[in-house]
A protein has these predicted regions:
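Glycine-rich anion-binding loop/nest that anchors nucleotide
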Residues: 1-5, 28, 110-116
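N-terminal glycine-/serine-/threonine-rich phosphate-binding loop
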Residues: 1-24, 31
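Short, electropositive, low-hydrophobicity segments enriched in small/polar residues
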Residues: 7, 50, 118
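Short acidic, glycine/serine/threonine-rich loops at helix termini
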Residues: 9-12, 36-39, 55-57, 122-125
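Short beta-strand scaffold positions
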Residues: 25-26, 46
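Acidic/Gly/His-enriched mid-domain segments of enzyme catalytic cores or analogous surface patches
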Residues: 33-111, 115
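C-terminal functional extensions of proteins
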Residues: 98-101, 109, 113-167
Length: 167
C-alpha cells in the first residue's frame, strides 16, 4: 500500500531490512514503492490494477486478490503478458489478505508500512469494506507493528570490526 509518508517510512527501515532480511510483500502499488527504494519484493498481492510492468516482472510471487466469487479482473493482464500468478479469492482488502497470509505462514512479526493505521487514515479510506480491516487487525494484533515503531525501537548491531575501527 502507498499510504501516508510511505517513502520516508521505508527509508527509515533500511538498517532493519539490511540486518533481518525480512520477506518483503508489496500490496498493489506498494510493490513499486519497494522497487523505488532499491529492494525487490518477494511477493506482490492485490488486484494488480496499480502495479507496474516492472514490478510484475521482478521475480516476485504474484497473488491476485479475487472477489469471493473467484472473479479477478487483474488476471487478464497477467495472462496476456504470460506472467505466472496464483488467484486467491477472499473478502476484504488486499492489505487484509497480505496480513492474513503472513499470519498463516507463522510470521513472528508483521511490519506494516503505508497501511491505514491511524483512526484518521482508517476513516479517511471511506469504504464500507474497512470492517474487514478491523477484523484482520484483531486477528494479527500481537504480531502487527507499524513501520514507524520499528524504526524508532530498532537499534542496529555494531559489528566487531566497527568497534575496532572506532577512534
Amino acid at each position: 500500500m502507498r499510504g501516508y509518508h510511505y517513502q520516508e517510512d521505508l527509508r527509515s527501515l533500511r538498517p532493519y531490512i539490511r540486518e533481518y532480511k525480512p520477506v518483503l510483500v508489496g500490496v498493489d502499488g506498494g510493490a513499486d514503492a519497494i522497487l523505488e527504494q532499491g529492494y525487490t519484493p518477494d511477493m506482490i498481492i492485490g488486484d494488480m490494477d496499480s502495479v507496474s510492468d516492472q514490478a510484475l516482472r521482478c521475480g516476485a510471487e504474484i497473488v491476485v486478490h479475487a472477489y469471493r466469487n473467484g472473479k479477478a479482473p487483474g488476471t487478464e493482464r497477467l495472462k496476456r503478458e504470460g506472467i505466472p500468478h496464483v488467484v486467491f479469492p477472499a473478502t476484504g482488502t488486499s492489505e487484509d489478505v497480505a496480513m492474513l497470509l503472513a499470519d498463516d505462514k507463522d510470521a513472528e512479526m508483521i511490519v506494516a508500512l503505508g497501511t491505514h493505521a491511524s483512526l484518521v487514515e482508517f476513516l479517511d479510506k471511506g469504504r464500507s469494506g474497512m470492517a474487514s480491516t478491523f477484523l484482520t487487525r484483531l486477528r494479527v494484533e500481537s504480531k502487527l507493528v507499524d513501520a514507524k515503531g520499528v524504526s524508532q525501537l530498532y537499534q542496529p548491531r555494531v559489528s566487531t570490526w566497527q568497534t575496532l575501527l572506532s577512534p
